[in-house]
Amino acid sequence: MTRHRRCRMRRKTRLRLRAPVVTLFLLACLLSLDGTGVLRTGLLCAILHESAHALVYRKLWHRWPDLTLSPFGICLQLRGVPMTPEEELRLASAGPLANLLACCTVLLYMQTAGQYSYSGYWFACTNLLVGGANLLPLPGLDGAHILHGMFYSLDKRHRI
């Protein structure tokens, strides 16, 4: 018996810009006015959050997702992707978990090394803010998807 090798086409991640002129203009203006680094830290935390979603997406479906950058943030395009509630739970919880892990890592490093810094605390707090805001159970945020996956799992366990 011979085994057939699965040939997977490697597809690059596409980054789509919604209202590209407005998005890039706002980003350039805000970054040029960001003297304290608040926006850069928030942008780094948002990229970390979405990267975790993209890595879990890659692990589950063996391809990279399409990303959309708009004036309101970065999001993964999931239209047309068949997803079980368990996969939805894994995918939705990856971003907030990455933010929590980054926060704990920075705080633990500062505690063990004895090197406390304002920027370290700011990075930790911003990660908590990004992760916590995404845990709100509002449509479009990770919290709604996590609740859907959890309720489905609980409902499935208690059926007779």
Labelled PLM ranges:
Residues M1-I160:
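Hydrophobic transmembrane alpha-helices and their immediate loop junctions
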